[in-house]
């Protein structure tokens, strides 16, 4: 088990396999964004090797993210390979859902354990306004097929004042009707997100309890993330809130992040970490990499710091 200086056991890694995306969400990735060269992106065999090394040190859970992970060719082969690594207990995926319907059979065959789908609106015109693509029906079809398959499913919604807050009741209704966890992620007021007004988690909960007075907080955790979950009598699913600003969750953080360029981040909001790509391509042994990772994780920050950030990369890591 890898433990940091504050005795937090690190057993979960989020791996971004690409910085590319087939949407241009206004708060995340505008039209004029520039991308990293393919030669700088970790190859699948490099990602697999990193996970093998980390699994030997106690990492048991892996989340595959992007950008949009499903746009990378043969990503399901990577999922299958990671699933076969001894010690890895769970491999999950976060996607915008555009390609979910077409790729669902391969994802299920690869053994993905759960899927998170990012969806901020159920309205076709609003979806196109927020994302730059008329694909709402495609995403909803993918969600429906995934739900029918029985795979554990979560929806991630970023509530934005004046953009989609009038749909909160519909998101609540989804959690009531379907065995799905609907999670509301607080907007970060950094980078492109500064131009939008976030909705605090307590406002989400106020509206939820107003609509469902008998609602209650769940004591159990659903999955590996920091969300706090609630339900109500008659609900098939749950709602969750992730208060990135107003309710920090640093004291229980159990995760590290690997960027698509091979940089191991200790904290989403910190520049500290380790260039694993340089070590891999520089000929370092597995033991040398393992020792370097163990040492750098000991320096994992106690709490969030918002200084010296690459805001574009932070936003992509938050919402993808």
PLM regions: where:
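Residues that scaffold the ATP/ADP-binding catalytic core of kinase and kinase-like folds
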Residues: 24, 28, 72, 125, ...
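Glycine-centered loop/turn positions within well-structured domains
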Residues: 23, 124-125, 248, 274
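Canonical Radical SAM [4Fe-4S] cluster-binding loop centered on the CxxxCxxC motif
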Residues: 5-44, 268
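Conserved small/polar residues in nucleotide/adenosyl-binding loops
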Residues: 307-310
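Accessory C-terminal segments flanking Radical SAM cores
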Residues: 191-305
């Amino acid at each position: 088990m890898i433990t940091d200086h504050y005795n937090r056991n690190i057993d979960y890694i989020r791996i971004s396999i690409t910085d590319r995306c087939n949407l241009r969400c206004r708060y995340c990735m505008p039209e004029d964004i520039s991308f990293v060269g393919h030669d700088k992106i970790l190859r699948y065999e490099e990602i697999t090797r990193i996970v093998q090394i980390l699994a030997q040190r106690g990492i048991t859970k892996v989340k595959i993210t992007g950008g949009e992970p499903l746009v990378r060719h043969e990503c399901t082969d990577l999922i299958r390979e990671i699933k076969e690594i001894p010690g890895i207990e769970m491999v999950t995926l976060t996607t915008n859902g555009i390609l979910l319907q077409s790729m669902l059979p391969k994802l299920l065959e690869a053994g993905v354990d759960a899927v998170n789908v990012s969806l901020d609106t159920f309205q076709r015109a609003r979806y196109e306004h927020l994302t730059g693509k008329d694909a709402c029906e495609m995403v909803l079809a993918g969600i429906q097929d995934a739900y029918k398959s029985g795979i554990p499913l979560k929806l991630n919604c970023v509530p934005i004042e004046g953009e989609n807050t009038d749909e909160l009741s519909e998101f609540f209704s989804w959690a009531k009707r379907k065995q799905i966890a609907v999670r509301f992620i607080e907007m970060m007021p950094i980078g492109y997100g500064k131009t939008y007004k976030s909705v605090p988690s307590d406002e989400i909960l106020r509206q939820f309890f107003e609509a469902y007075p008998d609602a209650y907080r769940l004591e159990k955790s659903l999955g590996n993330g920091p969300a706090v979950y609630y339900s109500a009598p008659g609900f098939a699913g749950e709602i969750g809130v992730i208060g990135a600003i107003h309710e920090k969750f640093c004291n229980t953080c159990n995760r590290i992040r690997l960027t698509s360029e091979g940089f191991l981040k200790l904290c989403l909001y910190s520049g500290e970490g380790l260039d694993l790509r340089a070590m891999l391509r520089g000929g370092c042994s597995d033991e040398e990499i393992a020792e370097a990772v163990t040492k750098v994780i000991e320096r994992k920050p106690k709490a969030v710091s918002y200084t010296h950030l690459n805001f574009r990369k932070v936003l992509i890591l938050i919402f993808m």
